[in-house]
UniProtKB/Swiss-Prot annotation:
Entry annotation: catalytic residues: 115 (proton donor), 179 (proton acceptor)
Subunit structure: Homotetramer.
Any GO molecular function: 3-carboxyethylcatechol 2,3-dioxygenase activity
UniProt-listed Pfam families: LigB
EC number: 1.13.11.16
UniProt-recorded name of the protein: 2,3-dihydroxyphenylpropionate/2,3-dihydroxicinnamic acid 1,2-dioxygenase
Keywords: Aromatic hydrocarbons catabolism, Dioxygenase, Iron, Oxidoreductase
Source taxonomy: Bacteria, Pseudomonadati, Pseudomonadota, Gammaproteobacteria, Enterobacterales
EC category name: oxidoreductase
CC cofactor: Fe(2+)
């Protein structure tokens, strides 16, 4: 069967700290075009690779990868909230297949996800509940982090499983590109934040969540004025990365260490491993070609903002 892929940056700052209207119109046009291509493909199953931002996964148990057999979006930063339509038996079968392939994939029957999962479903499909989805968490912020090689192998394992289903499969990768917003780190946290990172942050009081969101908004506003206030965006790296994906050279990323990536492009750039997993997955379907490449650094969203599609040719 055929597969389609779309990878898209996300940002909680959309609608809170937006770029100039002409930039916003440009991005919205890119997303609208991707949405049209996806609608024409008419997917029967979505595999969504996305990260978390200490809203669903914490240091009480922090897996490198987790498949949601059941999942609920919390609606942070005004993103969509509610249950994701996960086909339970299919998710269970996927987990077994991936484990048999040698990848230690965790599962959750009550996975809590944030805007990293919700935004691509909203922007590209029109809502959380439009198409059955297998939500796959890839740890992108909490050290120790999975590397490129293991993430690629995860994508390949999931791709091999879905290629046997006789369904039109849409692979989505959510996150990146270069960026380093103000995300807490366990090694530097005070007692209160440490407690939150160890798990109590899963059910934040509304007032504390609002303060947390306002800190991110304030950081973005300062970053627009002075891009020395956070790790700078890296358009050169971002474009080189997208070219590697387009040319089917993702295996070259295996040699890039987590420490090197953080130094080059920022500590939250590890979200790009969702793109790697998606491209690895579609590669198992046979020949494919990329389309719809777009990139622009957007300081207002603290992100090198990218969008890239691919489709199988068999």
């Amino acid at each position: 069967m055929h597969a389609y892929l779309h990878c898209l940056s996300h940002s909680p700052l959309v609608g809170y700290v937006d770029p100039a209207q002409e930039v916003l119109d440009e991005v919205n046009g890119v997303i609208a075009s991707a949405r049209e291509r996806i609608a024409a493909f008419s997917p029967e199953l979505v595999v969504l690779f996305a990260p978390d931002h200490y809203n669903g996964f914490f240091y009480d148990v922090m897996p490198p990868f987790c498949l949601g057999v059941g999942a609920t979006a919390i609606g942070d930063f005004g993103s969509a909230a509610g249950e994701l339509p996960v086909p339970v038996e299919l998710a269970e079968a996927c987990a077994h297949a991936v484990m048999k392939s040698g990848i230690d994939l965790a599962v959750s029957y009550c996975m809590q996800v944030d805007h990293g999962f919700a935004q691509p479903l909203e922007f590209l499909l029109g809502g959380l509940d439009k198409v059955p989805v297998l939500p796959v968490f890839i740890n992108g912020v909490a050290t120790p982090l999975p590397g490129f090689q293991r993430t690629r192998m995860l994508g390949e394992a999931i791709g091999r499983f879905t290629s046997t289903l006789n369904k039109r499969v849409l692979f989505l990768g959510s996150g990146g590109l270069s960026h380093q917003p103000p995300v807490p780190e366990l090694a530097k946290a005070d007692a209160h934040m440490r407690d939150r990172l160890l798990g109590s942050g899963k059910d934040l009081p509304a007032s504390e969540r609002e303060l947390r969101q306002q800190r991110v908004i304030s950081a973005a506003e300062k970053f627009v004025e002075d891009q020395r206030t956070l790790h700078p965006l890296n358009p050169i790296w971002d474009n080189q990365f997208m070219t590697l994906l387009e040319q089917g050279r993702i295996q070259e990323l295996d040699a890039v260490s987590n420490e090197e990536l953080s130094a080059i492009a920022g500590k939250s750039t590890h979200e790009i491993k969702t793109w790697v997993a998606a491209f690895a997955a579609i590669s198992t379907f046979g020949n494919w070609r990329s389309e719809g490449r777009y990139y622009r650094p957007i300081p207002e969203w603290i992100a090198g903002f990218g969008s890239l599609s691919a489709r199988t040719e068999n």
